[in-house]
Amino acid sequence: MLPAGDASDGEAAQPPACAIVLVSNGPGELSTWVRPLAERLHALQPLRPRDPRAACALRLVLVPCPNATGQEHRVARDWGLFERVLPAARFWWLLLRPRRHGPWPARGVVVFLGGDQFWTVLLSARLGYRHLTYAEWVARWPRWNDRIALMGPAAAGRLPRRWRQRAMVVGDLMADLSDQARQDEPLPAGDWVALLPGSKRAKLLVGVPFLLETADRLAALRPGSRFLLPVAPTTSVRELLAYGGPANPLLRGRAVGEPRLQDGELITPAGTRIRLLERHPAHGALSQCTLALTTVGANTAELGALGVPMIVLVPTQHLEVMQAWDGWMGLLARLPLLRRLVGVALTAWRMRHRGFLAWPNISAGRAVVPERVGPIEPAQIAAEAADWLDHPERLAAMADDLRSLRGAPGAVAAVAAMVRGLLPPA
């Protein structure tokens, strides 16, 4: 649906003359790539829906992704940045019959910001729009791109020489996150520890009780520690409370109490208070944390971009965590007859062959942040976190290392300028 406008205003009711179509997939890309670029584009020129009379509309198309939660389109709609948001479930129908999803202007630009790059090749060809790809590591279809924005020299080196005139190294889109985040409201003084258990049910089943117990133990070791937990847009406070209590099937048979909610804080049965952040993205608060305890995934990329030291946790004692992984291993882990037999073997194989799991480590090719994989326990992680907090110079060194990987800000502005350069003249 188009946003409602003044029905008596003929100019406002006119369809847009062009469209900028951002294409993405999972929740991490939406918060770290799509939203900053969309905000920048709105700041640079009039765009619908913020300006109903604008000649150009900003739209979002989501593509299939095994890591998606299915709620990304609702999250993006709430931002108020896009005239239209198309869920991933309708992507194939968009390719087959685009007119069924509303009128599409004759001219426009398709921008790849996550997923499989081939989807934007197909979509730009189907709509007859120009095409720009933001490539982290490799631009796979340079022949069918009008422009290519590259994250760094490594991606540029992988591009065939004949296509390099179309490309420009812009930097990491997430490098702007820290500067933007620090404009938000400051947290009260203290050593804040962020708890990030994940966004999907399989990870939350394991991550929430693990991190709540870790917080209890860390609070006992360091009573001055303060805790916050960003509530993923794909879950709710009520669900978090259920994951942390006896309703969690992984906790059956254990004498566990019920966490409760009071004044925007989750209070564990042991009395530890954890501030819940329902604003998304929570970059402002996260950027002020001294340390983060997080699962694998896009969380590690966001924390790295914000320069927040972290310990990355992959507890493998519950097979259910395997169901949150993508690809054939996650599918096998869901099979009721096979998952018990193959679970241990799959976990061992992945941990042996995958290498680094945290994005800062993958990007650097070395251990920038600690990864704790295996049958880890909350007491072990609490002791390690306390040791890090007792040595602020080590935390500062990790933060400096993360900032050096992030690179200089400015990528969002550079990509926005490339998008505008592909638009038809006004």
Regions found by a protein language model. Give the residues of each.
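Nucleotide-activated sugar donor-binding and catalytic core shared by glycosyltransferases
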Residues: 1-426
